[in-house]
Structures are given as C-alpha cells and as structure tokens.
C-alpha cells in the first residue's frame, strides 16, 4: 500500500520594517562657534574714519605714502606726521635715528620681519662738519631679503637735554626723483627718510653771489649781487643736493606747500621758510635766487644799484709845473669823490638794512622761474628750557626758632560743636566727641 502524502506548501511571511530616523533639534537663538568665541579681530567696516595700512606685496621699487589729511597737489602737499613705506627685497632704506615707529611684513610670510637687518650710519660726516651742518644726526639703515613695510614719524626721539629745541608740529612731503630734475634742500635737517639704489646725496657750498647769466638777465650788467642765502646770523654755508632716481621723505615745520613758477615769474619768499627748490645740477642755484631788500620811500633797488657809470674822457695836461698841479688836484678830487660816494653808499645800505631788520624783512629773497618750490609755514629757530617740576610733598618743620616742637596731628575724627553762654565771656563755642558727657557737665554746673 502506497501512502502518498501531499504536504501543504510552507509559506513564511516576513515583515519588512522601514524605519526612517528623524532628529528634531531646537534651533538656538545664536550659533556661536569656538572660533568666534576666541577671535581677536573685527571686520574692517567696524573701524571707520581712519586709514587702513595694507601689508606690502611684491614690489619692484619703494613706495612712499603720507598718512593724514592731504591737500591739493598744486597747493599743499600734506599735513600728516606719519610716512608709510613699502620696500622691495635688497633695497636699503635710510631713516633718521629715532624716527622708526613700526615694521610689519606680508601676509604670505609672517616671519618676513625676522629677516630685517639694522645698522647705524653717518653719511657725509666730514662734509657736514666742514659746511656747518649737524653731523651727529645718524641714519638707521634697514634692509631685508623679503619685502616689508615700515611707519616713520616726523619727530625723532633724541636723548634728553636741558636745552631742547622747540620743534613744534612737523609734516611730511614725498619727493619722487626720476633722474630728470635735481632738488636743492636748504633745510639740512629736513631729510627724514630716503631710499633708492641710484639715489645720490651730496653737499655743496651755498653761492654767495648771483651768476653773470642772471645778472645780465636782470639788466645789472657785470655787477655782482648777493644771493642772500648766506648771512652772519646763519652759520650754515652748505646745502644738500639730491639727484638720481629714488624716493625722499622731507619734513617741514607746520604745513608744507608747493609753488610752481612759470618762466620769468618772480616771487618773494622769506628764506627761513624756503625748504627746497628744483635745480639743474650743483651750480644752478645761483641762476635763480637774488637777495631782496624793500626800498626806502620811492627808492628803487635797480636804480640805486645799477646806475650807469659815466666814462670820462682823459684830460690832457701841459708838460709844465702848472699842468702837474692841475693833474694832482684832479686826482685828489677824484679820490675825494670816491671816498664820499663809498661813505654815502655804506650809510644808505646800513639805513636800508636797519629799516628792513626792524620791520622783519631782512631775510627775503627773490626767486625767478621756472622752478618748483617747497615752503614751510613755520620757522624753527627757538630754544626753550623745560619747566622744573615742583614736588607735591609739603615739608613740615619739626622745630621753630623758639625751640618749641610742632606736633603733627596723627588722628582725625568727627566732632560735635556746642555753644554756651558764660558770664563775662558771652557765647563760647566748643567741640566734643560725645554730647552725653557735655550735658552732664552742664547739669552739674547748673545745680
């Protein structure tokens, strides 16, 4: 018997569960990261009304920029007291000793300032000593193998002295020399910074007389007239000539202004305010400057100085004793006239110079264009003695002349005042620390 069992097919059902994870986080009012909690800088827009100093970049030549309120390029150069300088690698910069404010490098290399090397130099020491220029003002030389930037101040920190020069406010002006024009700097301590591998600085003697070229141009003939740059008050007889290619940072007292003179244009300037002037070589300064004095009344400088010389025809004398007497007499007369004219001219010059000195016009010079002129608004020629600080401590004498000891009260406190009426004395004011004891004493007296 064959049993055939037909089994039911076994079917298993598996439940598939699809679970989707949902995370609900409450959004905080402000998300503050660790970086924000520890940051030490702010966005540039939060700092307003101030110039931003940008880090130096790849440079081929030095860049000088004055910081502050700058005026028009045709009238005023600047009124700033800070000079920002960006320097390329291997180009030295010379700064007046004590004027360096800051050194900072580029963003890509934060260690670029570590390669800056410094040294102290005294350029043109012997020439400055000969021409009466302060030769003890050294210059700090900075150079680096990577580009860097610096800030330079218009004031130089110097060693303290009893007599200190009253410098006052100073401002910067930036000169760019392209090799076509030279600059004659008459204020020898005004060069605060300079840079340029082909920049040349030299010292030359100030011309005492104008050139024949200028004398003929003004119609003076071959007569010599002074430039007015040298005087017995001013012991400096030299000036600094800047030539070549480079950048120079000059400082002046007060504000610095630029004047551009066209051809044959003339201007009168107090020589103490003249900072610099463009020249063509070291011997061109005598071709544009002449001393000027204000004439007295209706006197003209040209008329008084350029009077035509009358050439007399030679006289013939008879070869006898009377002719010799006439010849001697005429020679004596000519000598007397020359002496009288010299005395008159000398007295007129003294009178004119004295008048100009009293009214303050003795330092004026005339400059003839075409020239570029830099003038400073203030004059630095005064010295001040700093005030002596007084001690705030009060010294109390211990003993007086009558050998009575003066004791200083060491305790302080609050006291109550009261008044009593005493016979024969009237109102008597007294003080007491406690009213209770005083009231008891008054009660005992009344009993």
Curated annotation (Swiss-Prot):
Transit peptide endpoints, chain numbering: 1-29
Subcellular location: Mitochondrion
GO biological process entries: inner mitochondrial membrane organization
Predominant subcellular localization, coarse grouping: mitochondrion
Pfam families documented for this protein: AIM24 (PF01987)
Annotated GO CC locations: mitochondrial inner membrane
Highest taxon of the lineage: Eukaryota
Record bears the keyword Ion transport: no
InterPro entries: AIM24, AIM24_sf
Gene3D superfamilies found in the cross-reference section: Mitochondrial biogenesis AIM24
Keywords of this entry: Mitochondrion, Transit peptide
Presence of the UniProt keyword Transit peptide in the record: yes
Similarity comment text for this entry: Belongs to the AIM24 family.
Name of the protein in question: Altered inheritance of mitochondria protein 24, mitochondrial
UniProt organism field: Candida tropicalis (strain ATCC MYA-3404 / T1)
Taxonomic path: Eukaryota, Fungi, Dikarya, Ascomycota, Saccharomycotina
């Amino acid at each position: 018997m064959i049993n055939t069992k037909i089994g039911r097919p076994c079917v298993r059902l598996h439940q598939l569960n699809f679970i989707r994870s949902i995370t609900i986080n409450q959004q905080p009012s402000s998300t503050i990261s660790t970086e924000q909690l520890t940051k030490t800088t702010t966005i540039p827009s939060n700092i307003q009304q101030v110039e931003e100093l940008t880090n130096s970049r790849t440079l081929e030549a030095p860049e000088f920029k004055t910081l502050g309120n700058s005026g028009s390029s045709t009238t005023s150069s600047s009124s700033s007291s800070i000079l920002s300088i960006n320097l390329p690698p291997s180009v030295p910069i010379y700064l007046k000793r004590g004027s360096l404010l800051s050194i900072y490098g580029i963003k890509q290399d934060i260690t670029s300032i570590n390669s800056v090397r410094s040294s102290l130099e005294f350029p043109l020491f012997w020439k400055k000593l000969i021409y009466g220029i302060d030769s003890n003002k050294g210059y700090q030389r900075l150079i680096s193998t990577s580009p860097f930037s610096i800030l330079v101040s218009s004031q130089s920190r110097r060693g303290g002295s009893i007599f200190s020069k009253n410098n006052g406010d100073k401002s910067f002006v930036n000169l760019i020399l392209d090799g076509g024009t030279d600059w004659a700097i008459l204020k020898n301590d005004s060069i605060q910074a300079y840079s340029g591998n082909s920049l040349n600085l030299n010292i030359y003697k100030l011309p005492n007389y104008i050139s024949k070229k200028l004398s003929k141009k003004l119609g003076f003939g071959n007569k010599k007239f002074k430039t007015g740059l040298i005087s017995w008050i001013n012991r400096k007889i030299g000036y600094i000539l800047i030539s070549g290619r480079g950048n120079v940072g000059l400082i002046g007292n007060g504000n610095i202004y630029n004047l551009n003179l066209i051809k044959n244009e003339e201007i009168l300037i107090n020589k103490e305010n003249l900072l610099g002037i463009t020249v063509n070589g070291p011997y061109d300064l005598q071709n544009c400057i002449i001393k000027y004095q204000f004439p007295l009344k209706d006197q003209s400088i040209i008329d008084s100085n350029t009077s035509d010389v009358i050439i007399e025809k030679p006289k013939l004398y008879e070869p006898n004793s009377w002719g010799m007497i006439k010849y001697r007499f005429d020679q004596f007369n000519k000598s007397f006239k020359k002496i009288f004219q010299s005395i008159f001219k000398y007295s007129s010059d003294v009178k004119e110079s004295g008048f100009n000195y009293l009214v303050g016009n003795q330092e004026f010079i005339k400059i003839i264009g075409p020239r570029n002129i830099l003038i400073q608004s203030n004059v630095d020629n005064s010295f001040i003695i700093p005030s002596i600080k007084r001690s705030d401590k009060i010294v109390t004498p211990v003993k007086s002349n009558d050998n009575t000891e003066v004791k200083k009260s060491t305790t302080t406190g609050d006291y109550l005042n009261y008044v009593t009426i005493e016979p024969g004395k009237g109102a008597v004011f007294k003080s007491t620390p406690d009213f209770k004891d005083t009231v008891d004493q008054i009660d005992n007296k009344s009993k």
